[in-house]
Amino acid sequence: RVISMSNNHSYDKGAQGIAATLRFWDDMPDDVVTTGLYAGEADYGNIPIQEKEGVRIAYLAYTETTNGLPTPSDAAANVIYTSQEDVIQQQIELARQQADIVVVGVHWGVEGSHTPTDAQRALGQKIADWGADVIIGTHPHVIQPVELLTAAGTGKTVPIAYSLGNFVSTQAAANNMVGVILTFDITKTT
């Protein structure tokens, strides 16, 4: 079980909300992995990894926006924005060294749009090039395409789901009532 805490609502309730979120998820069983909130820059190297049947899986999460809210000055943790490409690259490369599979979640794009933006496509390709194995997008509240990218240098095929739509929502528009569950098999070969 993996919980991404990096999205446009991460800062909605300020430092108290961040602290309450961290406390809640810290009390979960050990098989629950959280990602997307970091206790400052010193914590960026702490890559969330879960081992399943001998396969080490790293989970990273980023957000494009926090709806204009800055990181609260007294917050116990912060998100990493999609504009922080140097940090994202460093984390993916570090995760690649520590794990067999690197899964990257990105909260991005335009709400209500079925078409990925140029920025989504560009960052998605960079994330693939930096070493991600799977890229899972959220935020638009509607389904966007699932495609296969080719990582530069390695030629590795990297699936990207630009937006899974809504899983559970109170939004009434027909397009907002549809979501996708992305499934994939992981097989360790070496």
Predicted regions, residues:
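Acidic, metal/ion-coordinating pockets
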Residues: 1-190
